């Protein structure tokens, strides 16, 4: 990021909100401040990731647009200039969607501490398969470009006009003690953007300018629960905001078509969170009429039976 920000000068404001970390964040910031201007803020306590997002956007940021990046995320060459160009070319549009590719966090760890986007030249798996840049007439139409469940849940996907964002973010009531138990406390950024953008035009940047690393998140083990509790509620939110019914159905179908493994984990290997907030009975009652849901259920059962059979065979051979 440092060379890219240095290239554009004062067009970009970089803010680091240190959520009371115990690592070397402050030392890294001091190093980077030799080359670019960075505002550094440290929370006195760990306020949770969601609240930290809102501290950045609603209290610290002074620019016209905001782009949230996590501490593990990397950006590829020309990411900053491409976003700036999209903003300048489309002055009346409030939102830019940025595509990203996925890498395992273990691949990043193999390369040491000092890594950049250039260390991952292969694009890998993409969030959205559409790689051309264009304007969509309605933000929610981006749903058609992805076969990945949980589109829009990554903070890195969204570049947004802060004045419009703050109108909606002010309505979000965060409760750290309720983290991951409600849609707003799990994906407050998505709730904010959806209420801000449903039915409105957006810029779509199809090239994966961001590299998102998966597997290191402290909530990763509860991802199956989040998928089948909160991500399904995102489709409900879209419907409440009068999104096209076909797009709402597409969002749900994408989840069911590509989440059999996660469903199997949720059903056969429950976690404390899933026991607390997930109901299989309610899920089946609501979605059994959808062919994609029924197929996912059968695939999940087959996966479990297959693994059980293989495990039994291996134990028999070892004997």
Task: Indicate where each model-derived feature is located.
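C-terminal subregions of glycosyltransferases and related glycan-biosynthesis enzymes
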Residues: 191-194, 198, 202-319
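Nucleotide-sugar donor-binding/catalytic module of glycosyltransferases
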Residues: 1-227
């Amino acid at each position: 990021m440092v060379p890219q920000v240095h290239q554009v000068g004062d067009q970009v404001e970089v803010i680091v909100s240190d959520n009371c970390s115990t690592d070397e964040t402050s030392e890294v910031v001091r190093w980077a401040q030799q080359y670019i201007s960075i505002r550094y803020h440290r929370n006195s306590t760990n306020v949770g990731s969601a609240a930290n997002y809102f501290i950045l956007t609603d209290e610290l940021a002074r620019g016209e647009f905001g782009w949230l990046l996590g501490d593990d995320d990397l950006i590829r060459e020309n990411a900053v200039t491409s976003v700036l160009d999209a903003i300048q070319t489309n002055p009346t549009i409030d939102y830019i969607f940025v595509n990203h590719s996925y890498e395992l966090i273990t691949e990043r760890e193999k390369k040491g501490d000092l890594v950049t986007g250039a260390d991952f030249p292969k694009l890998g798996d993409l969030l959205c398969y559409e790689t051309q840049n264009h304007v969509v007439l309605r933000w929610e139409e981006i749903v058609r470009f992805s076969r990945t469940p949980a589109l829009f849940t990554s903070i890195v996907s969204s570049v947004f006009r802060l004045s419009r964002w703050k109108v909606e973010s002010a309505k979000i009531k965060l409760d750290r003690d309720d983290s991951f138990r409600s849609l707003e406390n799990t994906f407050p950024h998505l709730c904010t953007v959806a209420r801000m953008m449903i039915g409105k035009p957006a810029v779509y940047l199809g090239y994966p300018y961001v590299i998102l690393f998966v597997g290191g998140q402290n909530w990763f083990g509860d991802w199956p629960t989040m998928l089948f509790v909160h991500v399904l509620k995102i489709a409900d939110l879209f419907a409440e905001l009068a999104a096209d019914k076909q797009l709402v159905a597409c969002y749900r179908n994408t989840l069911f078509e590509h989440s059999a493994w996660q469903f199997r984990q949720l059903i056969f290997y429950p976690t404390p969170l899933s026991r607390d907030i997930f109901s299989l009975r309610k899920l089946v009652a609501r979605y059994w009429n959808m062919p994609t849901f029924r197929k996912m259920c059968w695939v999940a059962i087959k996966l479990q039976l297959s693994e059980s059979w293989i495990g039994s065979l291996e134990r028999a051979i070892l004997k």
